[in-house]
Amino acid sequence: MAAALLLLRALRQSPEPGPWRLWAQLSGRSPGLFSGAGGRRPYVVRGTPIGLAAAGGHTPQSLLLRILTPSFEGVSGLLLKRHIVPSAIRLWQLSGSTLYFNTSGLKQKNKDDDKPKGKAPEDDEEERRRKEREDQMYRERLRTLFIIAIVMSLLNSLSTSGGSISWADFVNEMLAKGEVQRVQVVPESDVVEVYLHPGAVVFGRPRLALMYRMQVANIDKFEEKLRAAEDELNIESKDRIPVSYKRTGFFGNALYALGMTAVGLAILWYVFRLAGMTGREGGFSAFNQLKMARFTIVDGKTGKGVSFQDVAGMHEAKLEVREFVDYLKSPERFLQLGAKVPKGALLLGPPGCGKTLLAKAVATEAQVPFLAMAGPEFVEVIGGLGAARVRSLFKEARARAPCIVYIDEIDAVGKKRSTSMSGFSNTEEEQTLNQLLVEMDGMGTADHVIVLASTNRADVLDNALMRPGRLDRHVFIDLPTLQERREIFEQHLKGLKLTQPSSFYSQRLAELTPGFSGADIANICNEAALHAAREGHTSVHTFNFEYAVERVIAGTAKKSKILSKEEQRVVAFHESGHALVGWLLEHTEAVMKVSIAPRTNAALGFSQMLPRDQYLFTKEQLFERMCMALGGRAAEAISFSRVTSGAQDDLRKVTRIAYSMVKQFGMAPSIGPVSFPEAQEGLVGIGRRPFSQGLQQMMDHEARLLVARAYRHTEKVLLDNLDKLQALANALLEKEVINYEDIEALIGPPPHGPKKMIAPQKWIDAEKEKQASGEEEAPAP
């Protein structure tokens, strides 16, 4: 604090503005002393200004120099050593110092030469403003250096303390070796301060720290304990350690705490003052960068990027967003009819369906600026940044209007605001959401700024965000249909080198992948190409796609996991039970492949089915799906008279289907045609249920009856076909993998007619037929 007061006093006495005058006054020299004599060329001053000052004397300036010189030199050396500042010249520039100094005569000559000749008044005003900005920058840099010097001085004073020691270390390492100079007792804190001789050797090394603190249990008997230790060490009376008592008192401690608090508050005030200078020249840009929205600008006029032709499928969604593109291209066509284009659109749908890809296509097709930003980038740990970034984003959008603002994963900032009854509240997120609502449809809303947002959690969005006037156009992007999957495969297969035309694979792959998203389809095509490259093929073949589909569905085969003979038999009968029940029942899907090879997704085996693109299910179809899922557990119980934990996933699926039939689909006669929302995982017990406890017990009872009836039916089917179950299990134990043709050869065709299937083996046969016509021969899978 004394150093700070002295520095301020010297600053007030400085005759001219600028930091170098201050350093010159503190050192007792004038700027002319550092220049060449007469008209000689000035030279660059090496070293710090404080380091050039005289160290002697007892003036306030010399005292301040002795305090601040080590700190300044330490900070300068650290910045240069760590390469934080590239050179000493740059360090002088940052600290506001002057590199070149002239004599007074040369300085006056330069002023005369630099006088403007025939300048306009506005040029003089601009020159005056430039000098004011430079002076402001100098003052801010000097204040920054002043704070660094004070902090380093405090740290330097604290560095003389060597920390805490124990009584044993004090006696054995210090007292016994004669390194203790004096001892000071602080009774109020039960602390003893031990001062050592300069150059003392402690723990085998010379120590720079000369003061150590020691906690004492009974401070009143410390001196008695010290004298007893000296007696044991045979220390003579003249060499005994002097003991003094330090009583600070209440006012001393209070003044010390008040002083440290004042220093901390002053530093905080200065930091926030710098933050308030953002936006003006001379201010620190770091605070301004925090408040700026980190968005990505896509210029659609360049023609580079994703177009609607590159987005396969999503026909209805593209029609919805094309209206925004048409409005931005030719708004007069809409305005002359009095139409108002929606302010924004919300893209909804499961993950991986192409919401972000569609937004990129809009950016290219609209040929207007496209400002994209992710929802999580708004909210930070510092309060108020989210709202500031929203304002910054829309300010930039208005300046570039007409334009499109795209917010990805808007659920990060658009969650429903908490009510007074709930204790889960996030003020920062709510403030960000409120600012977003105002910018989208508030008093200062500007036209020609369209907002697009995407999320896969529309249920958590605030109602005010979804109302007409904001995100009033809701575009739902569902999982692709069979035709859309074929188009997506065609799009991704264009970049692959194939043995057959892309149309040969696209239809079959689309039928193999019901329920797959666009991201899953892209992953399959990429995995097929990677597998072909690993195998050393020059093009992608059918079995590469077969491997890719199997890898995405069940994972890769884990050859390092070796099962015992008994476990292999259990897995074989388990998977055979699934396959046999699915083969014999009427409303089940075709079994494409059965494998007992362990997989990386923790599955010991799997049965690959070919589900249909179906949107309506009857009670009989759902019941037989439950029977097929229970086929593995029933086969284990029949074959081994015991069950294992391998059916855990099957039981989970059966339970979900049973409760859906009872609670949502109204398929339980005793419950009636009612439907209740599905309970969300992780929220059990939170909120009120829309049914009574008695009705809950009735639904539980109906679900148990439904599962029990499905299990009995599954057991009956397997008991009536034990020979077929045994044949399938033996084939699996022998080959590990069997397909549709193998099952048909073992147990005959399905009793309810052939099931629809797409066997990859037929693709290979088609390739072989083409090879016979003279084309390149495909390697064996």
From Swiss-Prot:
GO molecular function terms here? Answer: ATP binding; ATP hydrolysis activity; ATP-dependent peptidase activity; metalloendopeptidase activity; zinc ion binding
In short, the EC number is 3.4.24.-, 3.6.-.-
Q: Which prosthetic group or cofactor does it need?
A: Zn(2+)
Post-translation changes: Upon import into the mitochondrion, the N-terminal transit peptide is cleaved by the mitochondrial-processing peptidase (MPP) to generate an intermediate form which undergoes a second proteolytic cleavage mediated by proteases AFG3L2 removing an additional N-terminal fragment to generate the proteolytically active mature form.
Q: Which SUPFAM superfamilies match?
A: FtsH protease domain-like (SSF140990), P-loop containing nucleoside triphosphate hydrolases (SSF52540)
Tell me what reaction this enzyme catalyses.
ATP + H2O = ADP + phosphate + H(+)
| Top-rank lineage group of the source organism | Eukaryota
Q: What is this protein called?
A: Mitochondrial inner membrane m-AAA protease component paraplegin
Q: Which organism is it from?
A: Rattus norvegicus (Rat)
GO biological process: one example:
anterograde axonal transport
The main place the protein resides is mitochondrion
Q: Where is this region: Interaction with PPIF?
A: 701-781
Task: Give start-end positions of Basic and acidic residues composition bias.
Answer: 109-134
Q: Where is the transit peptide?
A: 1-43
Choose one Gene Ontology CC annotation of this protein and give it.
Answer: mitochondrial permeability transition pore complex
How the cofactor binds, per note?
Binds 1 zinc ion per subunit.
Q: Which residues carry this modification: 3'-nitrotyrosine?
A: 505
What subunit structure does UniProt give? Answer: Forms heterooligomers with AFG3L2; the m-AAA protease is composed of heterohexamers of AFG3L2 and SPG7. Component of the mitochondrial permeability transition pore complex (mPTPC), at least composed of SPG7, VDAC1 and PPIF. Interacts with MAIP1.
